[in-house]
């Protein structure tokens, strides 16, 4: 019987990836469609991706697929053949290729069956996710962004918005997408006659958000086709002025792709302009925060002197401290509240 999951330690897999010299292509894609047997679909696709040497993160659900992956460059054409043939709905599915890519974005393939391909918290049988807003191409985005009757709404999390966003975009200040949906409806209740343009990283969240806004009585709803990734690619190809400023946060080892040269965020430790996200080197913390090179050297990659000191303790004592903490701290913690508390600095609302 074929092995349908990874059996090698993360440390070994990461070391192998870092030692690789073969070029790889980082790509993301998603598709909403009905899967009758998500488990069988997952197992078949996993087997084929393993043979191709694909790394990354893939979520499969009855409502479709959501993937961020890394493919050996010399097998990219094979990968497309496999993917396009995996289901009729995936034939010629749009692939968002990374802008900045050193081939080190992922080191293991994880493919999971979930209830939803994006956690939305929607519990309403009358909601139709296929009834989505109008797609906007890059040139249309640029036309609409200066329209006073149009609002651009960022459907990403606070830490994503902080390092980059469309000009004058509205932030829906939350830690999760499921929180954002009802918040966006409430925030825009008095703007139902305006054009509402939703956007996100690659399109998956803003597409569902556009359907949710229509479901809640908004009429003129749009979303950026392919999200920020596709917008930036097309704008550069077509020589259009970039209306997205800063960095596009991505959920892999890179943690960001530079779209424009603007640095709009600040180091959470000293306040100097910086937009480099990192996780605290103390495994008992692992807080996601922004750190400039000077503070990275000063605090040795940690978020605070406390974590810096703890990191110097023997491994056994570090483990004992982690085990003794009440409830612990979630790995890759992205909570805005925890960031404010841990860093002891006021975080701006926008």
From Swiss-Prot:
Keyword set, alphabetical order: Oxidoreductase, tRNA processing
GO molecular function: oxidoreductase activity, acting on paired donors, with incorporation or reduction of molecular oxygen
GO annotation (BP), single: tRNA modification
Catalytic activity annotation: uridine(34) in tRNA + AH2 + O2 = 5-hydroxyuridine(34) in tRNA + A + H2O
Superkingdom, taxonomy of origin: Bacteria
PROSITE patterns per the UniProt record, alphabetical: RHODANESE_3
UniProt cross-references to InterPro entries, sorted A to Z: Rhodanese-like_dom (IPR001763), Rhodanese-like_dom_sf (IPR036873), Rhodanese_C (IPR022111), TrhO (IPR020936), TRHO_N (IPR040503)
Active site: 200 (cysteine persulfide intermediate)
E.C. no: 1.14.-.-
Domain Rhodanese: 146-240
Family of this protein: Belongs to the TrhO family.
Function noted in UniProt: Catalyzes oxygen-dependent 5-hydroxyuridine (ho5U) modification at position 34 in tRNAs.
Protein name: tRNA uridine(34) hydroxylase
Organism: Yersinia enterocolitica serotype O:8 / biotype 1B (strain NCTC 13174 / 8081)
């Amino acid at each position: 019987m074929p092995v349908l999951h990874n059996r090698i330690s993360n440390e070994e897999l990461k070391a192998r990836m870092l030692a690789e010299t073969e070029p790889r292509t980082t790509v993301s894609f998603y598709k909403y469609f009905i899967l009758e047997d998500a488990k069988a679909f997952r197992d078949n696709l996993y087997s084929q991706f393993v043979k191709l040497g694909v790394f990354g993160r893939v979520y499969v659900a009855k409502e479709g697929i959501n993937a961020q992956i890394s493919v050996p460059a010399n097998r990219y054409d094979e990968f497309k053949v496999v993917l396009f043939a995996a289901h009729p709905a995936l034939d010629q599915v749009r692939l968002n290729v990374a802008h900045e890519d050193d081939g080190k974005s992922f080191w293991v393939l994880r493919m999971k069956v979930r209830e939803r391909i994006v956690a939305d918290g929607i519990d309403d049988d009358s909601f139709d996710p296929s009834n989505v807003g109008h797609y906007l191409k890059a040139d249309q985005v640029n036309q609409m962004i200066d329209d006073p009757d149009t609002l651009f709404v960022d459907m990403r999390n606070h830490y994503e918005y902080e390092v980059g966003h469309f000009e004058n975009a509205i932030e829906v200040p939350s830690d999760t997408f499921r929180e954002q949906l009802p918040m966006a409806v409430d925030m825009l209740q008095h703007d139902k006659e305006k054009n509402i343009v939703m956007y996100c990283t690659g399109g998956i969240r803003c597409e569902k958000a556009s359907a949710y806004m229509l479901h809640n009585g908004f009429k003129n709803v749009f979303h950026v086709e392919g999200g920020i990734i596709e917008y930036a690619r097309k704008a550069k190809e077509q020589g259009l002025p970039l209306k997205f400023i800063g960095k596009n946060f991505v959920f892999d080892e890179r943690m960001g792709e530079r779209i424009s040269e603007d640095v709009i965020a600040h180091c959470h430790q000293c306040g100097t302009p910086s937009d480099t996200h990192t996780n605290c080197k103390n495994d008992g913390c692992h807080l996601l925060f922004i750190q400039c090179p000077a503070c990275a050297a000063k605090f040795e990659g940690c978020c605070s002197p406390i974590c810096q000191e703890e990191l110097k303790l023997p491994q056994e004592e570090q483990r004992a401290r982690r085990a003794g903490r009440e409830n612990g701290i979630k790995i890759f913690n992205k909570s805005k509240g925890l960031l404010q508390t841990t860093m002891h600095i006021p975080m701006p609302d926008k």
